[in-house]
Amino acid sequence: MLVAELTSPHQFQVTDVPPVADPEPGQIQVAVKAVGVCGSDLHYFSEGGIGDARCLYPMVLGHEPAGVVVKTGPGVSGWAAGDRAVLEPALYCYHCELCMTGHHNVCANIRFMSMPAEPGFFRELVNLPAQNLLPLPKNLSDAEGALVEPLAVIVHSMHLATPRPGETALVFGAGPIGLLTVAMLKLSGIRRIWSVEPVGARRELARVMGADAVIDPSAADPVHEVLRDTSGRGVDIAIDCAAQRDTINQCLHAARNAGRVVVTGIPAQDHVSLAFHIMRRKELTFYSVRRSNHDSETALRLLESEPKRFAPVLTHQRSLSEIQTAFELCASYSDGVGKMTIRL
């Protein structure tokens, strides 16, 4: 089977390796058909790691997959060869304190496929526990199915942000996560959404996804613009999907008193300095997002019921053999790329 391995910074190698073994009891073997390129994949590609997680080469990335069932292991029911599925990359222990109290996303023993030492989905075949598959509705393409994992992260972030109809929101970053965040905020009834993004094509995509105003941070100070537009009040919710330079602190400055700040993006550096006294004086509620917490089924239902709301983020597709140039395009923000999907 073909597998794409990141062998060093900026370098993929596609090789033919022996196929995976037959699925064990409780497992399903799946032929991977589409995998979205995540911002964290790009961190590994461009920077050799993300935050304090460093690459262990060779490394198989990709954790936003959809595929087709090939065969089932002993004891599996409800699935048959040919069934289309969304695949969940998180492998929880289900018995630690955190799992037992509903915090599966921070499971003490979690294994997340595409992390160092846990191969991801840029490969043709994979065996997964049966509970890690969800049926892919007929009205969704494989590429749309690959949106479930990132959209589930946004659903989780919305549980933290608690958007209410009539409120205002600011979103830093209009990459795929930022774009999906804008769409979910609009769906939640947010009255006005500002999107901050330096890349022109992505600002236009943000408008398509539901942003009411877009700001180029290289041309204007986002905090000044938002405070001016809100007569000094600030926004109810500030969400950082970029975590670049000083965007987290800009969220603190742009949020209203007693507002909510949510950080979905992942900073490249190990330590981030916060304008704590701004946060303290405003009594802001501050959330950091760790993936999703059993939100995939909700995300799938949203995609099934409103595919046109989320589909514009899907701008590019490439084959597995083209993964090198696909990542180079994404890393350079070229050609108006939003979400890149790798086809298998």
Please report, for each region that a protein language model flagged, where it lies by residue:
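Mid-domain Rossmann-like dinucleotide-binding core that forms the NAD(H)/NADP(H) cofactor-binding site
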Residues: 84, 140-219, 224
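Glycine-rich cofactor phosphate-binding loops and adjacent beta1-alpha1 units
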Residues: 161-164, 204-285
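Rossmann-fold dehydrogenase core element
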Residues: 260-262, 274-313
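Residues in the short beta-alpha loop(s) of Rossmann-like NAD(P)-binding domains
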Residues: 199, 267, 292
